[in-house]
Regions:
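A conserved ligand/cofactor-binding region detector
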Residues: 10
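Helical "substrate-binding/catalytic lid" subdomain
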Residues: 21-149
Length: 155
């Protein structure tokens, strides 16, 4: 099976992590990191939207993704989402998801590993079901862009 996976993977895009379960564990941690990174993007762009300036958030996302220390594929995807809907008015801030984040936080607690950023980002996903915030819209929009995750359309 490994030769088949290696033959279809992009260069350096395949990793055998160890015995049964190790790959799922690594993916769980990956998703936890993703939760925190998305939450940080959402909070930062909500700050930009709340500023007393008329800021072009699409241009900011594009600029930050061009050599800035926080450049990332997620920031590129946010720029794409903002390009078509600069205020993200077509969707709600209900982020959805939460299953792998919960697994990550529960596992961290069992191991005694502090993961406050990831835990708080999980709680903010639950909060997004109650409150429609721009930060939640940012997270939902980027999740739609990279994973085709469903978003709730604004009424």
């Amino acid at each position: 099976m490994i030769p088949l996976l290696e033959s279809v993977a992009r260069p350096d895009g395949y990793l055998h992590c160890g015995p049964s379960g190790a790959g799922h564990y690594v993916k769980m941690v990956h998703n936890g990191i993703e939760y925190a990174m998305l939450q940080a993007l959402g909070e930062g762009f909500e700050m930009l939207r709340s500023a007393p300036y008329d800021l072009d958030m699409t241009a900011i996302a594009r600029d930050w993704n061009n050599g800035c220390v926080i450049r990332s594929w997620m920031l590129e995807l946010l720029g794409d989402a903002l390009e078509g809907d600069p205020r993200l008015d077509t969707l709600t801030g209900d982020v959805g998801g939460g299953e792998t984040g919960r697994w990550m936080v529960e596992t961290a607690m069992e191991l005694g590993v502090p993961t406050p950023s990831i835990a708080l980002s999980l709680l903010m996903r639950f909060r997004s079901r109650q409150d429609d915030t721009f930060a939640g819209r940012v997270v939902a929009a980027v999740r739609r862009e990279f994973g085709g995750h469903a978003v709730k359309e604004a009424e």
